[in-house]
Amino acid sequence: MKYILVTGGVISGIGKGVIASSVGTILKSSNLHVTSIKIDPYINIDAGTFSPYEHGEVFVLDDGGEVDLDLGNYERFLDIRLTKDNNLTTGKIYQSVINKERKGDYLGKTVQVVPHITEAIQEWVMRQALIPVDEDGIEPEVCVIELGGTVGDIESMPFVEAFRQFQFKARRENFCNIHVSLVPQPSATGEQKTKPTQNSVRELRGLGLSPDLVVCRCSTPLDTSVKEKISMFCHVEPQQVICVHDVSSIYRVPLLLEEQGVVDYFRQRLDLPIGRQPRRLLMKWKEMADRYERLLESCSIALVGKYTKFSDSYASVIKALEHSALAINHRLEIKYIDSADLEQETLQEEPVRYHEAWQKLCSSDGILVPGGFGVRGTEGKIQAIAWARKQKKPFLGVCLGMQLAVVEFARDVLDWKDANSTEFNPKTSHPVVIDMPEHNPGQMGGTMRLGKRRTIFHSQNSVMKKLYGGHEYVEERHRHRYEVNPELRRELEARGLKFVGQDTEGERMEIVELEDHPYFVGVQYHPEFLSRPIKPSPPYFGLLLASVGRLSQYIERGCRLSPRDTYSDRSENSSPDAEIAELKLPMIDHE
């Protein structure tokens, strides 16, 4: 097993996750099996109870693990399936060690950070690195480990010490350290400054880890003189200083690393069995990056939510929209709308914000209401859904978005004026959305319906069934505490709101579609978690197709994209990558 540790310096949030994912991508393109581990030095057991403002979205895995959004990057880049143990936190490690101490496993010894915590970290990494993450079930050959935070933080000290020890346990030919650092370029002088990187590497080396590659994040390509200066002061060769400057899309990052000889370096440094033949996967990434820059037409989607000021709160949703837009060769324009701005209260207090929000909504090609929690902004979301339904505007509701679509329909079409979710009004006389029996209101963490679940289609004419390739069932990831009230299903369906997908018991409403509408779909699960750059999520793909007026044509063609639909350059000589043109949908295992 080969281990590649990715650390960061100067500031957090400089792209360690994308760089770690890109390293994994170029290794996977060399026919290696790659897995990833993300280490978060916070004391929380997992990311499940985080506020989206605090830490971005909570990414959900097949096994129900609520983890850091960087694991979403790993899954999308590498097309792998991770588990909750691929996200290691200080809380998990301390909980594990304390449980052992309570059982008497340490035989009365004084339990300390060194050696007990550090050894537990190493054991966790070695154990998890061997778990297969690819569909073929083959054991990984390379494990890319991202250490969150910045070097020197008090929180990350036990992890840095653990890897200082681990480099000797794994042996030099099996362990490599990539250090990601910022090279700022003040606008006043325009000069690239190396001092922050020098100090960061010096601190890392003082803690016992010496970087093999120094990856410099900068706004423009590094000057040769700057590379040489970093090389001299950071104790590395000039070819070990890698520049990752700002690029048009993240699809360019693996290509940037490959161009600078990172694969050749790993071949020698880690003695990896990598040939010199052209790498087909990277050719696909290059094709995607080139296509992204050639897009001529655009499609606007209104994202109506309550966390719109912080785009990381909807990271996977945004990626799923981007994947779908790229598949039909349209540039995506997302219009972020705070749902509270659509409410009558805002009209009274801030009429300008109210009218600006409605102008954004009305001028969009499609509307998306993603998942969320809490009562704030829900009436605004319901107003947006009502507008989409009445104006025949393509609409997708995810999780809470689906629940509110049912609430809006019940209020307006069935004339149940007080219809609501018991989450927002426990005393409503028409509880259209109710809490599930499994829900434990006394405890927040891990009490939701989580992870991969099967949804059975109950309608042959369902648009969603066609978008999923005509399969009898699909398996998608869930994260919710509330569900549509199954007792009201018959009354809702009688008026045209069809529940075309249910769980395996037929009790939980999973997919809803509205009759006589171009595209009005709600899904209880979160399809964005399984969207991939070359395999867009069907619900999001349907929204984009409907928004550009091509959904009917796509379905008539047997759910296949024509070359004309998938290429922005309309010249006769253009021909798209066939593998992207004929859209790949997520693999479904039939037992």
Curated annotation (Swiss-Prot):
Q: Where is the Glutamine amidotransferase type-1 domain?
A: 300-554
The chemistry this enzyme catalyses reads:
UTP + L-glutamine + ATP + H2O = CTP + L-glutamate + ADP + phosphate + 2 H(+)
Active site (record annotation): 399, 526, 528
Q: Does the keyword Nucleotide-binding apply?
A: yes
Family membership: Belongs to the CTP synthase family.
Q: Tell me the function of this protein.
A: This enzyme is involved in the de novo synthesis of CTP, a precursor of DNA, RNA and phospholipids. Catalyzes the ATP-dependent amination of UTP to CTP with either L-glutamine or ammonia as a source of nitrogen.
Record-given protein name: CTP synthase 1-B
Q: Which organism is it from?
A: Xenopus laevis (African clawed frog)
Q: Which gene encodes it?
A: ctps1-b
